[in-house]
Amino acid sequence: MASSGAARPLEEQSLPFYHRKHYYPVRTGDVLKDRYRVIAKLGYGAYSTVWLGWDDRSKQYASLKICIRDDTKGSPVLNEVAMLQRLSRFAQEADHPGLEFTRLAQDIFHIDTPTGPHYCIVTKPQGASIRTLQEVFPDAVLPKLLVKSLIHRLFVSVNWLHATCGLIHTDISPQNVLMDLEDDSSLKDIEEQESQDPSTPIMSQGIPIYRSRATMLELSGIPILTDFGQMRPAQPENRDWWMSDLYRAPEVLLQLPWSFPVDIWSIGVMTLELLEGKNLFDPIDRTNDQYVLPLALAQYIGYLGPPPLEIIKQSPLFLTYFDEKGNWISDPPIPQASLEDFVTTISPGKEKDAFLRFIRKILTWDPEIRATSVEIIPDEWLMKPWDEKF
């Protein structure tokens, strides 16, 4: 039975800066564009709710990402729509293996309301995110062979974005990589659950808020890169503060120009996270929930060594944190850390040596010498046959 007032915030209501007027009041059973029937809620985020739908024209399941109403300058919603339209044009021009691992829009339309339009992005339904997958493994450590499979394919996706589309994702993380569904069985299960036990929304000032249905966890090893709200063209030059805190490339940290190499960096940091179940960098003041720039710099130096003098001399932060010779002069002190010690899930020996060579091609201060997707895809550690020992 619907309630007139929720005792506790539910799903999107619990997000910071939530305003009910910004979310479209979706109801199960709604038919959008005279074509897409809403079956059940799959998830939510700061800029959208996501629903399982049925496409009456193609007779297939569809994922319906119904975005908040946001027409402000720099809106991630408008940016994602523009980027998806651009990706679709490139996808039609030429085939590329990266298309298999990139979530493209099948349809984009807007729903008109008295307060303004809401975009709806239609895509092929996918499984849970890698972040959700981490939660089912002990200590959030994924099997090494699964990590190799995921990371290799992500580099193929990124190669298409960079080389063909001229676009930088900028927000690659386990949350923004979904697992491909091998078939529709889990979607049929959700529809059956909804039929037998219909979702009842909590009503808040006339706005329905539904609980999400869980999607199937797949171990196919096929990742689908998604969420393009923070995507940027490589031109004109980017040099503003960007990227997620735990995956931020050093050139962004140093307020230098940045481009395609930031995505390579993010995948490298993510590789370590999936193998070890923890983040390489944690420059967050947990008491105040704030990112601490000097703490980040100190941690980067701890794992990567001091940045090249010719790099940091270009940074506006140079004399704030370093002396004229490039020595660290700030607090906190440089932590005693090494990649060798951080990596514990690969035993010492030839394979660990190969992995450290792989990761050091990626985690570099200088983006100019950081491996590109083309250079890293054939790497020995990444491509070593699964049944062949080092």
Describe the predicted segments one by one:
Residues 1-390:
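Intrinsically disordered, low-complexity regulatory segments of kinases
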